[in-house]
Amino acid sequence: MRITYPSIDKLLSRVDSRYSLSVLAAKRAHELEAGDPPTLEHFKCDKAVGKALEEIAAGKVTVDPAHAEVNLED
């Protein structure tokens, strides 16, 4: 799958890594599919992942570092 809108450059300006972007988009897409209200009125994409990416690009959805989980193994 190739992302053309929103551009990957715009998305990465909002999130610090591709990994964080993919996790954030997946979590938001699940929330949208579960019935959470969207943060934008109009979307170019019909699918939940596309809508999540549009919300991230618009700055409506961000990573909350206070709730980030890090598991380290010795």
Curated annotation (Swiss-Prot):
A molecular function GO annotation: DNA-directed RNA polymerase activity
Keyword Nucleotidyltransferase included in the entry's annotation: yes
Pfam families the record matches: RNA_pol_Rpb6 (PF01192)
Membrane recorded as keyword: no
SMART domains given in the database record: RNA_pol_Rpb6 (SM01409)
Record's GO cellular component terms: DNA-directed RNA polymerase complex
Record field: catalytic activity: RNA(n) + a ribonucleoside 5'-triphosphate = RNA(n+1) + diphosphate
EC number(s) from the headed UniProt entry: 2.7.7.6
Annotated InterPro entries: DNA-dir_RNA_pol_omega, Pol_omega/Rpo6/RPB6, RPB6/omega-like_sf
GO biological process: DNA-templated transcription
Keywords carried by this UniProt record: DNA-directed RNA polymerase, Nucleotidyltransferase, Transcription, Transferase
Domain of life: Bacteria
Role summary: Promotes RNA polymerase assembly. Latches the N- and C-terminal regions of the beta' subunit thereby facilitating its interaction with the beta and alpha subunits.
Similarity comment text for this entry: Belongs to the RNA polymerase subunit omega family.
PANTHER family according to UniProt: DNA-DIRECTED RNA POLYMERASE SUBUNIT OMEGA
Assembly information from the UniProt record: The RNAP catalytic core consists of 2 alpha, 1 beta, 1 beta' and 1 omega subunit. When a sigma factor is associated with the core the holoenzyme is formed, which can initiate transcription.
Protein name per Swiss-Prot or TrEMBL: DNA-directed RNA polymerase subunit omega
Source species: Lactobacillus acidophilus (strain ATCC 700396 / NCK56 / N2 / NCFM)
